[in-house]
């Protein structure tokens, strides 16, 4: 039997904000307020720093309250990097496929923790980038767009389901 090795990202991790329709709808009334006075016209991204990475099964100290963020991470790379992703080594560089778009080398379940904050536009780093606040599962082979859209992610804490994320509700 081949044991599953713990995996952590070897490159930069970017997270999208306002990526689920319910989040976008929740924050829509505030989008017309300063400082931006309009809805975003491009993806709003944030970076998870290396100190946030925690392996699957790790004990993470979380102050109350904490926001849980079950999500699916996409490992970016070309087809030659797929074997590395399966072996637990994600490639950090973004390589383009034949159509000029990045190729998805694999997928990984993530729990993106954060502390509650009043603004998506400028949350202090200390709310998102605390030690262990990105719990990483084990990478798997890439999925098609249809397979991804059909997924639901359930997050359980102490055996109790506390969050369900339906990927069909992503903002397109």
Describe the function of each predicted region.
Residues 4-172:
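Glycine-enriched loop-and-adjacent helix/strand subsegments that border the catalytic/binding cleft
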């Amino acid at each position: 039997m081949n044991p599953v090795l713990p995996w952590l990202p070897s490159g930069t991790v970017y997270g999208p904000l306002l990526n689920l329709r319910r989040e976008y709808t929740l924050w829509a009334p505030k989008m017309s307020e300063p400082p931006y006075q309009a809805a975003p016209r491009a993806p709003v991204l944030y970076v998870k720093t290396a100190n946030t990475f925690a392996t699957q099964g790790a004990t993470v100290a979380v102050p109350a309250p904490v926001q849980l963020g079950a999500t699916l991470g996409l490992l970016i790379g070309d087809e030659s990097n797929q074997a590395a992703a399966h072996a637990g080594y994600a490639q950090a560089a973004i390589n383009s496929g034949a159509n000029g778009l990045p190729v998805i080398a694999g997928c990984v379940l993530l729990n993106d923790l954060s502390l509650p904050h009043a603004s998506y536009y400028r949350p202090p780093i200390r709310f998102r980038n605390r030690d262990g606040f990105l719990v990483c599962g084990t990478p798997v082979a890439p999925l098609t767009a249809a397979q991804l859209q059909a997924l639901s992610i359930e997050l359980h804490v102490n055996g109790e389901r506390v969050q369900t994320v339906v990927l069909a509700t992503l903002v397109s």
